[in-house]
Amino acid sequence: MTLTLYSMPSSGNSYKVRLLLAHLGRAYRHEGMEYGTEELARAHAEGTLPFGKLPVLVLEDGTPLPESNAILCFLAEGTDWLPADPVTRARVLGWMFWEQNQHEGTIAVRGALRTYAHRAHLATPERMVALLDQGHAHLERMESHLAGHDWLAGDGPTVADIALYAYTHTAGEKGGYDMDRFPAIRAWLDRMAALPGHVGLTDIP
């Protein structure tokens, strides 16, 4: 039995896992589902999604692993994507916690409000302005760090870079953020896309 990934092709959180699996060269079966589909309703009904959301990675023995960043850490264990050095690993995890606690709540949310029809009614002018301002502030934090470093943590790419790449690389197109303000981020995005094994958001196996 091989790995099975339940994922939403349009979602950055699901994309993180597909991207790392591609970099690791791991074979897996992909079960894609979007909002409003029968597949997603069935996954909920059958209890496939432990926390009620995607992605979920089901291991060879049938064990389900929810939460994108937890899955990244599991898959990356023992590789350079998750450094063994305790200090470097803590820095990696710090960026990943920040991604879920701060970055995703603005960058991803604003993109979702502009992208998914069933969320359009939540996109009030006041909320969209607030998300734009907060998102730019979060991008500025990344810009400040990347202006002096090629990668977010350590001397090479880690799962921290994958976690932040997923929603940052579509922040301009989906979220309407002004990425011209962030040359260091744009250079980092180019470095990520140039890595061997890279796959795009729409590259579904």
Language-model segments: which ranges?
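Proline- and acidic/polar-enriched loop/turn elements at helix boundaries
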Residues: G32-M33, P86, T158, A184, ...
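GST-like domain detector, emphasizing the conserved glutathione-binding G-site
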Residues: M1-V129
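Residue-level recognition of oxygen-bearing side chains
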Residues: A70, A184, G197
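GST-like fold's C-terminal all-alpha helical module
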Residues: M96-A193
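Charged phosphate-binding loop/patch that engages nucleotide di/tri-phosphates or the phosphate backbone
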Residues: R191-M192, H198-L201
